[in-house]
């Protein structure tokens, strides 16, 4: 039982002890990888840098990443966060970019057919402490 758990949407801006955290699944990375030479599924933090530069979580979309037309674009990054966390690629990375820690969470899931098709090997069960 998790009495203190709060469920949020995707993306989410949450404040933890005064620290502004941007949490995003990372689906937008799928459209960035084929279009940017330095961005790979093994180095998703490069996509995160582009997202921060462009101030949008899906600066390229339409090929693999469909976006719902809404009155307000929920993918816009109005202000840079103190911490930016994403996943989706099942990679693992921690890197600082312009004073912002970029955290790519690992996975507990095994290799999927999609990953096999891409020739990508996930980095499983990596925890930071």
Name each model feature, range by range.
Residues 1-129:
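Extended recognition/assembly regions associated with phosphoester-bond processing machinery
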């Amino acid at each position: 039982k998790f009495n203190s758990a709060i469920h949020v949407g995707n993306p989410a801006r949450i404040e933890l002890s005064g620290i502004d955290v941007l949490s995003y699944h990372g689906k937008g990375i799928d459209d960035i990888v084929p279009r940017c030479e330095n961005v790979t599924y093994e180095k998703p933090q490069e996509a995160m840098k582009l997202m921060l530069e462009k101030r949008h979580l899906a600066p390229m979309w339409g090929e693999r990443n469909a976006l719902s037309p809404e009155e307000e674009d929920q993918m816009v990054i109005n202000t840079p966060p103190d911490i930016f966390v994403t996943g989706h690629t099942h990679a693992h990375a921690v890197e600082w970019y312009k004073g912002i820690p970029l955290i790519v969470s690992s996975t507990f899931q095994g290799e999927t057919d999609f990953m096999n098709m891409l020739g990508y090997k996930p980095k499983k069960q990596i925890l930071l402490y």
